[in-house]
């Protein structure tokens, strides 16, 4: 795992660190594509102690993080792989216990649960042709038509709570939406789609602006690699993607 340096600390404190997610949060440690464990790092400058707790240790204080540099704590957990639920247990100097989801988590539990989830992305994009064309695209001279949508309410489907029960709303997954969205956009000659917030948020009824995880695509529609599939397929269809 990459070391957290004085330079990282300087740019983090000044608000200028543009790749902080590469060093903070939970990262798989691999050797020849085999996951050996997970490295955790979190910034908790006012903590006395910090623990990583989760399903893997029965949510107990068996994995204490080490102070690394000026309020940054880190820990490597051997053998911990993808899709493990976890939180940080922060002990304050006056003895209070505070349970926190990871602000740099790449995946989260489905609401109403609130834990973060380790995640190993394996997706390989195949949109290089579109990416190359984007460099040459002149927005001042070529048409731009943007379709804005909220994934949670677009093309809603309904399922029964139980046999003979009243129908209830259900979400399409990222993969379910992909062919439907591409067809709609192409039929109506849109060049781009703008997705209302798809980062993790607590309320199904909201548009997603109450963000609880800026690096975590909401799990109500599926896994992060399934979102990557959606973006990849849109690009391959010649459609740009804007994230609100």
Could you describe each region identified by the protein language model?
Residues 133-137, 178-189:
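Short amphipathic alpha-helices and their capping/turn segments at secondary-structure boundaries
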Residues 43-50, 57-59, 81:
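Short proline/glycine-enriched turn/loop motifs at strand-loop junctions of beta-rich domains
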Residues 156-172, 183-228:
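Aromatic-lined carbohydrate-binding/catalytic grooves of carbohydrate-active enzymes
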Residues 1-39, 60, 67-148, 153-165, ...:
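The feature marks proteins involved in alpha-glucan
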Residues 50-52, 86:
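Short beta-strand elements bearing conserved aromatic residues within extracellular beta-rich modules
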Residues 145-149, 193-195, 241-243:
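Hydrophobic faces of well-ordered beta-strands that scaffold small-molecule active sites
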Residues 224-243:
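C-terminal EAL-domain catalytic cores of bacterial cyclic di-GMP phosphodiesterases
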Residues 54, 153, 197:
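Residues that line or immediately flank small-molecule/substrate-binding pockets and catalytic motifs
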């Amino acid at each position: 795992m990459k070391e957290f340096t004085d330079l990282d600390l300087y740019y983090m404190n000044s608000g200028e660190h543009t790749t902080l997610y590469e060093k903070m949060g939970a990262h798989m440690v691999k050797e020849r594509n085999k996951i050996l464990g997970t490295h955790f790092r979190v910034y908790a400058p006012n903590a006395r102690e910090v623990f990583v707790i989760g399903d893997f240790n029965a949510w107990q204080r068996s994995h204490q993080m080490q102070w690394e540099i000026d309020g940054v704590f880190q820990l490597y957990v051997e053998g911990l792989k993808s899709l493990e639920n976890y939180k940080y247990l922060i002990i304050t100097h006056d003895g209070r216990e505070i349970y926190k989801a990871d602000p740099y988590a790449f995946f989260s539990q489905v609401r109403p649960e609130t834990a973060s989830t380790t995640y190993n992305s394996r997706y390989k994009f195949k949109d290089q042709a579109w990416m190359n064309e984007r460099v040459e695209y002149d927005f001042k001279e070529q048409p731009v038509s943007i379709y804005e949508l909220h994934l949670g309410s677009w093309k809603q489907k309904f399922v029964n709570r139980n046999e003979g029960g009243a129908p209830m709303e259900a979400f399409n997954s990222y993969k379910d939406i992909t062919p439907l969205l591409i067809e709609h956009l192409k039929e109506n000659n849109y060049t781009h789609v703008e997705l209302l917030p798809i980062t993790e948020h607590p309320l199904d009824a909201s548009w997603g602006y109450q963000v609880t995880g800026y690096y975590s695509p909401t799990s109500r529609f599926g896994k992060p690699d399934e979102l990557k599939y959606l973006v990849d397929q849109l690009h391959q269809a010649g459609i740009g993607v804007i994230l609100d």
